[in-house]
Amino acid sequence: LSPSASSNNPANDWMVKSAEYVLSEMSPKVFWGENAPRLASKMGAPVVKRLRKIADENGYTFSIFKTKSLLHGLSQVRDRTFYFFWKGDTVPLFEYINIPPTMIADDIRAVVNDKNDPMSQILCNEKKPSDDPYYKFILDSIEGGITHKEFAAKITKTTNVQDYIEEHTTYNKVAEWMREHGYDNVARKCDRAYHKLKAGGNIMRKGVEIPKDKIGAFVGHMPTSIAHPDEDRFLTVREAMSLMKLPNDYQMINAKRSLNHMCQNVPVTTAEHPAAMVKKYLEGKLD
């Protein structure tokens, strides 16, 4: 959904045109799709109005199902919206779902990195997490010289290294440590961060993420920022794909350059429930 959500925004035409064609030319019992959570908000109302009109004109009833991945057993904070065109004037009642999410650290540990699996041999980020200057400051200065594994065991929630630093000290002190250890460029960034925060501004925090309970949406910088919970490395492509619940034998073409492709899809388990509900509807098993 285009952020503007204007009913005539060309970026939203694919939903309208696909619905017009499928409902008028193919006339299925149900036609459904997936979109951003904005579709179920006030911002998406103009698009929803157009889709409802198409439904009415073709003898269908339109409905929306908004959900979050945490309800589908996935330890990822990620809301999604599914939309449906049901032939006739009624819609089925979906079964409620609330599968407790697992711990993200345990999800990563459970992945088997097979030496014969190409996706298990490719790291999303070939650097070492503990070589990151901010994380090194935490391990050596704040924590007194512990290992990545020890820090990961200590924390109780997924931790961004910059958030952790801000909870324990200020960037002007971090800048001093950075200069003492030869990280002059990082020291200058710390100086800017200190003054910006002091003035009431905000900064971007895209540093190393140490996984524990759950993570935010697995998009953007996340695939290259999440560390393994035990080993001082970043995730393999196989481990990254597992966070989207992709099949264990799934292979990506040009995986290193295509990391964002896995992120731009709805997690498999999130889509699994509405798919199961559509199947039950077609089998006459829903009210």
Locations of the language-model features?
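Class I S-adenosyl-L-methionine
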Residues: 1-198
